[in-house]
Amino acid sequence: MSEEKPLKVSYSKQFVRDLTDLAKRSPNVLIGSKYITAIHCLLNRLPLPENYQDHALVGEWKGYRDCHIQGDLVLIYQYVIQDEFDELKFSRLNIHSQTALK
């Protein structure tokens, strides 16, 4: 049985800004069970429940995925598979219209 590679987690500057803004506007979202469940699943490489509408993105976001946290709030992320470790990149956390997704 092969051992799972370590997972490195990184955050874009825009994700950090989105997270900070969301914490000011709607702090309850960040402690809500849907956000915590999404982060738990991603960090543990588990599939997200179907109601998160997790899907691959296309166009300028090709290679990324997004999932719906609550209403129009989406989390955009990417898994990057590398030789020594895998990386989970958090890119955006904002309402759909603010993420340039179509």
Swiss-Prot record:
GO terms for biological process: mRNA catabolic process; translational termination. SUPFAM superfamilies: RelE-like (SSF143011). Keywords: Toxin-antitoxin system. It holds the Pfam family YafQ_toxin. The keyword Kinase does not apply. Gene3D superfamilies: RelE-like. The keyword Repressor does not apply. Toxic component of a type II toxin-antitoxin (TA) system. Its cognate antitoxin is RelB. Belongs to the RelE toxin family. YafQ subfamily. PANTHER family: MRNA INTERFERASE TOXIN YAFQ. NCBIfam families: RelE_StbE, YafQ family addiction module toxin. This is Putative toxin YafQ. It comes from Haemophilus influenzae (strain ATCC 51907 / DSM 11121 / KW20 / Rd).
